Amino acid sequence: MGNRRDLGQPRAGLCLLLAALQLLPGTQADPVDVLKALGVQGGQAGVPEGPGFCPQRTPEGDRAFRIGQASTLGIPTWELFPEGHFPENFSLLITLRGQPANQSVLLSIYDERGARQLGLALGPALGLLGDPFRPLPQQVNLTDGRWHRVAVSIDGEMVTLVADCEAQPPVLGHGPRFISIAGLTVLGTQDLGEKTFEGDIQELLISPDPQAAFQACERYLPDCDNLAPAATVAPQGEPETPRPRRKGKGKGRKKGRGRKGKGRKKNKEIWTSSPPPDSAENQTSTDIPKTETPAPNLPPTPTPLVVTSTVTTGLNATILERSLDPDSGTELGTLETKAAREDEEGDDSTMGPDFRAAEYPSRTQFQIFPGAGEKGAKGEPAVIEKGQQFEGPPGAPGPQGVVGPSGPPGPPGFPGDPGPPGPAGLPGIPGIDGIRGPPGTVIMMPFQFAGGSFKGPPVSFQQAQAQAVLQQTQLSMKGPPGPVGLTGRPGPVGLPGHPGLKGEEGAEGPQGPRGLQGPHGPPGRVGKMGRPGADGARGLPGDTGPKGDRGFDGLPGLPGEKGQRGDFGHVGQPGPPGEDGERGAEGPPGPTGQAGEPGPRGLLGPRGSPGPTGRPGVTGIDGAPGAKGNVGPPGEPGPPGQQGNHGSQGLPGPQGLIGTPGEKGPPGNPGIPGLPGSDGPLGHPGHEGPTGEKGAQGPPGSAGPPGYPGPRGVKGTSGNRGLQGEKGEKGEDGFPGFKGDVGLKGDQGKPGAPGPRGEDGPEGPKGQAGQAGEEGPPGSAGEKGKLGVPGLPGYPGRPGPKGSIGFPGPLGPIGEKGKSGKTGQPGLEGERGPPGSRGERGQPGATGQPGPKGDVGQDGAPGIPGEKGLPGLQGPPGFPGPKGPPGHQGKDGRPGHPGQRGELGFQGQTGPPGPAGVLGPQGKTGEVGPLGERGPPGPPGPPGEQGLPGLEGREGAKGELGPPGPLGKEGPAGLRGFPGPKGGPGDPGPTGLKGDKGPPGPVGANGSPGERGPLGPAGGIGLPGQSGSEGPVGPAGKKGSRGERGPPGPTGKDGIPGPLGPLGPPGAAGPSGEEGDKGDVGAPGHKGSKGDKGDAGPPGQPGIRGPAGHPGPPGADGAQGRRGPPGLFGQKGDDGVRGFVGVIGPPGLQGLPGPPGEKGEVGDVGSMGPHGAPGPRGPQGPTGSEGTPGLPGGVGQPGAVGEKGERGDAGDPGPPGAPGIPGPKGDIGEKGDSGPSGAAGPPGKKGPPGEDGAKGSVGPTGLPGDLGPPGDPGVSGIDGSPGEKGDPGDVGGPGPPGASGEPGAPGPPGKRGPSGHMGREGREGEKGAKGEPGPDGPPGRTGPMGARGPPGRVGPEGLRGIPGPVGEPGLLGAPGQMGPPGPLGPSGLPGLKGDTGPKGEKGHIGLIGLIGPPGEAGEKGDQGLPGVQGPPGPKGDPGPPGPIGSLGHPGPPGVAGPLGQKGSKGSPGSMGPRGDTGPAGPPGPPGAPAELHGLRRRRRFVPVPLPVVEGGLEEVLASLTSLSLELEQLRRPPGTAERPGLVCHELHRNHPHLPDGEYWIDPNQGCARDSFRVFCNFTAGGETCLYPDKKFEIVKLASWSKEKPGGWYSTFRRGKKFSYVDADGSPVNVVQLNFLKLLSATARQNFTYSCQNAAAWLDEATGDYSHSARFLGTNGEELSFNQTTAATVSVPQDGCRLRKGQTKTLFEFSSSRAGFLPLWDVAATDFGQTNQKFGFELGPVCFSS
């Protein structure tokens, strides 16, 4: 389960894959030369060669090979071990010189899964890599740039290192380990996180003898004064090839104008292909020497997989001259090229002092070895981890000091040794994986298959044949030039050079003592902007600046503490009807009402469920004999027929026993290429082939149907530059690029403009105190800054010093209404004053509390189209496409030689239109079109909202009292105000006295339901009243006139805030007051409660289009829209910035069928095929003649109860019924529950004054109350000067209530008084008795729609109403906000080919890839030979009845049938005419003597012609055809909405030729109305696939900071359990899903887990699965790494195991029984930290039977 590839702890070392080579010839103790097996020593791998460990060793000196990052060599391990196993105990023998570096890997052995089994890492610590190995102790650094001889002995559990002929202490290992040879052996490593060994290597041997490591310096790696060891044995009996000598004394000719090399004389020579002196071909000749080694029966030498950088010149290298040096007599040769390259400037023969170019006469490429080559490409930047320190660039030179005194002359020094190499630079970060390459070329192996009785070829011939085909196809396998890779890593540090000539004069002596201070130097250049200094001390307060702009509104303060309860106020007047309260508890069911009038007839209801089986009906009377029936069904099969003709050839029989091997036959001719075989196992990386030549352009083919999107193709070649396209939309910002290497220092640039201030860096070390600078000139005053954004509320500051007295402030607003004062002395009764004039309109009240949620407003007109939304996320992987059909068999042709590259052909003519394609997926919704022309001016809009109130006006001068105006008429009722906020529950009123029983009032007309008031506190239980008799229905009374105004009551408590009044006009600006002192910072208030949503305002006119807003937060996933029509081809956009290569995506599901292949050439005439199936159904025949009416049928059985009909439309209201008779008096009911509080009653009579309470303590500051409504104008007062606050006066005695005074003249508005103290909470009043029922109130307003009642009984069917008229289009709405990114749309049409992108950089070597998808269809082959006639196919499905055939020839007369039954006696015919008298007969025979018998009546056969039927037979056949077609669709449904299938597997079994697509199924086989549409994957055998809901298809990456790790996603605030939909986006019925699971045997589903710095399955840092995710199936079972179920999970890609960056992990679930899938929930465990995120993509679930 999952990806078990365990790489162990990440080490900074490279694995040494020890290709344990078993040697065919030789003994078991002979070591295996790995370098020779890899082709390094033979020169096939193209690895540079140079001097080795002992260059002076006789006879020819040691030679070594330079390997590095670009020399990743590999070979299949099984080729190294033909006997089939790796030695259990062995030794590693190595001679190398490594470059100074960190840990690096020299050799690695991988198994068939790509996991490393064994490796050797070199560096400061040498170690064997792999599960059972550990680092080995060593006393010497093996990567210090010097030659070392290293040997490692692995003997059982003991591992011993021998470094430079000195054995180190052994290390106890983990025991022997089995090493598989089914993988790959690589010189270096294939892991991108590790570094490949860089340096020179001379020997790399593997000996099956563990003691060989202790004899390394004597037998295999001797000292320089000893001879070289004997040649080792290569694997598989590879013949020994004499190593080419690299030494000579001749001088190469100088043919080009290249620069002359600077190497030593003995290293200037160019190696030639001359044989050794003792060779048989050591003679003067102009022929190229060849070395032929006979290998009659040996298999071919394994060719190593080489990945090198080669330079192909395209020129044939030929030896033109060979001569003998007269001095030494040795053979000398030079290489020249036929092409004239003298004029090329860069033809340089200087490649370095020790490594040269190896030139091969038979190959057209030069392999350039490292040396003093050209400057390499720019490497990728190194990533500086936190905590690392690097030396910065050198600073500017300091001032020149005074010349010190000359020191004494030192003794002459010895020539110094070469210095140690400098430290290596940090390795660059690994590059991003390159684009996945195209599928490789398929080689057709022409094996002959045994057929009939012919003898098959032997195995050796097949191998020879395969080898010949491989050689012939190598020329044609050259692929096109691949894309240029990414820039490589920085090149390795070169090898230290040989000791140079005598050095120049030595360096200066030590620095002398510090001289005197020199004179001031010239002023320096303006330095770079320094870091911002630390904040200085707080300056003195400046002068008062100009008054700034009005700041932003501050943040709302926290609510204050709760105040004490106020005194109980008097009962106020009944308020307006409140808003609808919450729905109360459901009351008891009322008494059953009388049956209403029957409603109108409803529509036909839905079909009901089948009723119970009825009783058997009465046996009917036998009916009259029926008419002659139709033709009956075919009879039973007859007896066996006669012997038939000879049949066709049968199927091949079972395979017989294997015969004895025959004698080897002569080689046959090349056979016909066979059919393509099945996909083989994963191959190893092949050689990088040379670039092939481009073929000629073929003729244009016919346009095929539009195919489904294929995999991402290789970047195309550069096309002709098109016309200038329109400017495209701005692309998204790309990823930040890596920092490049430091370039060469440029010239001094001009001083740039000062840049923006950078971010504060870390505080640096304190510098030395500098000299005091000169005082600069005072700067000019800066401009006034713009208004800043209000900052967050700061911490309370310390109280500042008291400021000076400010200017008088502006007049403050009217203060809040003060607390109720104590009862004053009774005033004198004043005279009734004249009615005052109408007061000025009051100031607008403060904004009330948010009212209850209003009704939904009308839909606004469609807004201006918003900007184009961001593109949606990538959809989940699609289903894997089906395997294409096999192509036509081609003719047997021999591959020709590759032709010359043809010129670019002309563009072909447009081909004929192709056949109609398969219905493609619906395209994406097209982009919003351009803004249309300006329309006509719209209708006048609604009046705008009232403007903001103006500034407060100054207090006007007191006007004279005007004359009393006439009494105005009673104005009309005002408009209904906005509903006020919900009032609190009222205090219980005083206990009232029980009233007398009132007379029964008249019954008023039914009023509209009133608005439901708020739920008040429960009242006291009243005395039970007597039930009154029910009075007759009386008419509604008229509204009474307004009563006289009563005497003013006592001052009440602050009332409930009234409804919000209309906004008043803006007042005049008030005078500016003095600026007051700054108050102390108040305590933060509590957070206020959230108000309800207000009513929607009327739609305003659309405003002008504003600027594009910032992208909003991701919205909730919307409902899946209908697929729109495919959009038009967009115009070509500008070239985008080249993005980084993404990570390898998860393998997609099976794709849809590909397009049909090209039409093949006409084949040869085939043999006669079998008889075809019956033809298609013919056209309908002419209508037959009308038949005679049949006899009435017998009484049928009662039919089944029909299904329940659909609910009919509501009928028209019936006429009102007659008033009912008053019902009898009911029984006394049980005591009911306490009813809801009634509306507030009228104010009671004033009670006696209560006793004065004690003075309460000052309460805490209460919450700021809402501004009350404007009060009535008060009496005119005299403006008094505000006096000081007096001491509280003594409480006076209660005075008698004064007489009601008349309202005085309106006085000027008084000033706001100080706030009074909070009073103490009053005592709770006594509970009053229940009052008498008041008179019926006026009918209330129509209330809102009540809650949905229980479903009523099904009424009779009503008449369908007339469709209403189409409504008028609404007004244009305001422009909508930019919507969230839409769901993933269907694949659009392919865009135009883009311009050639920038040249990419060379990428790193990738891992061994997975098996690629099937390649594209190859070129059209030649016509093949006619194939062998195949066996007869299975019997086809019966086709529909064919057309009526023409009248056939009359058949032979049939056999006389049996005697029929005697017919009924016919009616006597009429008397015929008398016939003529016949002739006299001959005399009869003599009679018998016995008694006479009656003569028998003989029948005679008289042929009577049958009547001809005209047209009737065709009508009968048409009816039979229609019936048979319907029966066939019932038996084998086609998967339509009317005839849904059971599951997709059944559809595939009944219709095997159906293409993949969406079909209707009905798993529970009930009514077809609950069928649903699914995707059927017939390519996979008929899988039924359901899609997940759009909400779970892509859950974006999020930190989920408020969620708990390990919890199910359904418990998250935004989460819920997974759900699945059909192809139309509708949820799948649970019952149907259960039936689908019952009908399925297996199920599979993909789940992609997106992560950021988090693990999803394996945690590679700890090596365990403690952070693995858990999954919940629909059967309630849980699946994780520790909990297994019937379902299995595999993890083919686990990118989250490293817990670094953003990546993905792909889970593939499969279940042998479909109970676990689909998935219901997921629980992530690794999140919660600040840099961790996770999301997921839920794939479709597919069931198969």
UniProtKB/Swiss-Prot annotation:
The keyword Mitochondrion does not apply. The keyword Transmembrane helix does not apply. SMART domains: COLFI (SM00038), TSPN (SM00210). Residues 211-391 are annotated as: Nonhelical region. InterPro entries: Collagen, Collagen_Structural_Proteins, ConA-like_dom_sf, Fib_collagen_C, TSPN-like_N. Residues 1016-1025, 1190-1199 have a biased composition (Gly residues). Residues 62-224 form the Laminin G-like domain. Detected in fibroblasts (at protein level). Detected in urine (at protein level). Residues 391-440, 482-538, 824-877, 905-950, 951-989, 1430-1488 form the Collagen-like domain. It is found in: Secreted, Extracellular space, Extracellular matrix; Secreted. Residues 1514-1744 form the Fibrillar collagen NC1 domain. Residues 426-439, 489-499, 597-619, 765-792, 967-979, 1116-1126, 1141-1152, 1234-1243, 1405-1416, 1458-1479 have a biased composition (Low complexity). Residues 230-304, 322-362, 387-439, 476-1492 are annotated as: Disordered. Prolines at the third position of the tripeptide repeating unit (G-X-Y) are hydroxylated in some or all of the chains. GO terms for molecular function: collagen binding; extracellular matrix structural constituent; extracellular matrix structural constituent conferring tensile strength; heparin binding; proteoglycan binding. GO terms for biological process: cell-matrix adhesion; collagen fibril organization; skin development. Residues 724-733, 1318-1330 have a biased composition (Basic and acidic residues). Disulfide bonds join 1585-1742, 1651-1696. Gene3D superfamilies: 2.60.120.1000, 2.60.120.200. Residues 392-1489 are annotated as: Triple-helical region. Residues 1-29 form the signal peptide. Belongs to the fibrillar collagen family. Type V collagen is a member of group I collagen (fibrillar forming collagen). It is a minor connective tissue component of nearly ubiquitous distribution. Type V collagen binds to DNA, heparan sulfate, thrombospondin, heparin, and insulin. Trimers of two alpha 1(V) and one alpha 2(V) chains in most tissues and trimers of one alpha 1(V), one alpha 2(V), and one alpha 3(V) chains in placenta. This is Collagen alpha-3(V) chain. It comes from Homo sapiens. The lineage of its organism: Eukaryota, Metazoa, Chordata, Craniata, Vertebrata. The gene is COL5A3.
